[in-house]
Regions:
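Membrane-embedded alpha-helices of multi-pass membrane proteins, especially ion channels
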Residues: 19-32, 51-60, 114-122
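Cytosolic, positively charged, low-complexity intrinsically disordered regions immediately flanking transmembrane
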Residues: 134-173
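Short membrane-interface loop/juxtamembrane segments of multi-pass integral membrane proteins
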Residues: 73-100
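Alpha-helical transmembrane segments and their membrane-interface junctions
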Residues: 104-127
Length: 173
């Protein structure tokens, strides 16, 4: 009797599963109370500042790293680095810095959207969700993994895009 292999749950799946308790919890907290609302805003601001500081520190580590003159073949398009036309490469330092800047841009745009939704229309759920998802987005930035956690061997460049739904990836196994 051979046991059927159960497919591994993709790493991003917990983010999708965490949404339901967050939405349920947001209905249980009285955000009409000024203290609760200000506490949520403070937590949101702290998450944004810590996420931005982590990305900025990673960017400093990228610029100070040795071996940045090595080349990455076929890095894909980005507004944050220039590819050499003759051999379709970019330096490792420029590539890693570009990936950190892309994540930083996503952070900034997300914060802008959340602030508009909250301060213009009064929604609080997006702030709660952002407090959960933003640190996981920073954690998933491969440049953060390589330069802050030393996971160089686990993430050979060019890095694959993380796009797609984790539920879809899990269902295809």
């Amino acid at each position: 009797d051979a046991e059927a292999e159960t497919p591994a749950v993709p790493p991003g799946m917990w983010r999708n599963l965490a949404m339901m308790p967050m939405m349920w919890l947001s209905g249980k907290i009285d955000f009409a109370d000024e203290f609760n609302l200000n506490l949520l805003r403070s937590i949101f601001a702290a998450v944004v500042v810590l996420s931005g500081a982590t990305l900025y520190f990673t960017l400093l580590k990228v610029k100070a790293a040795k071996g940045n003159e090595r080349r990455v073949k076929g890095p894909g398009q980005s507004q944050f680095y220039t590819i050499k036309e003759e051999d379709d490469t970019v330096s490792v330092g420029e590539y890693d810095a570009g990936k950190v800047k892309e994540t930083l841009l996503q952070l900034g745009l997300g914060v802008c959207v959340m602030c508009v939704m909250h301060f213009k229309w009064g929604y609080v759920q997006p702030l709660m969700i952002h407090c959960l998802l933003q640190p996981s987005q920073v954690w998933d930035c491969k440049a953060v993994q390589v330069h802050l956690r030393g996971k160089e061997a686990e993430y050979p460049r060019p890095w694959k895009l993380g796009g797609g739904s984790p539920i879809e990836a899990w269902a295809q196994r």
